């Protein structure tokens, strides 16, 4: 494989992994432990 192909596959899989991880953090079981600063300061 050419270097550009390997590099583009690596970068796209890295971005996909970061996206999947951030969705898991936002909506997964860990999301119950996240604090909401807007709810803390509502009046």
From Swiss-Prot:
Localization (cell): Plastid, Chloroplast thylakoid membrane
Topology of this chain in the membrane: Single-pass membrane protein
Major subcellular site: plastid
Record's keyword annotation contains Transmembrane: yes
Keyword Membrane: yes
An example Gene Ontology biological process: photosynthesis
Transmembrane segments: 5-25
Any one GO CC term of the record: chloroplast thylakoid membrane
InterPro entries per the UniProt record, alphabetical: PSII_PsbN
Keywords, ordered alphabetically: Chloroplast, Membrane, Plastid, Thylakoid, Transmembrane, Transmembrane helix
Domain of life assignment: Eukaryota
PANTHER family with a match to the protein in the record: PROTEIN PSBN (PTHR35326:SF3)
Function: May play a role in photosystem I and II biogenesis.
Protein family per UniProt: Belongs to the PsbN family.
Family matches, as HAMAP family: PSII_PsbN
Record-given protein name: Protein PsbN
């Amino acid at each position: 494989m050419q270097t550009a192909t390997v590099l583009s596959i690596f970068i796209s899989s890295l971005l996909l992994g970061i996206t999947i991880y951030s969705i898991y953090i936002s909506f997964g079981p860990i999301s119950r432990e996240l604090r909401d600063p807007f709810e803390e300061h509502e009046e």
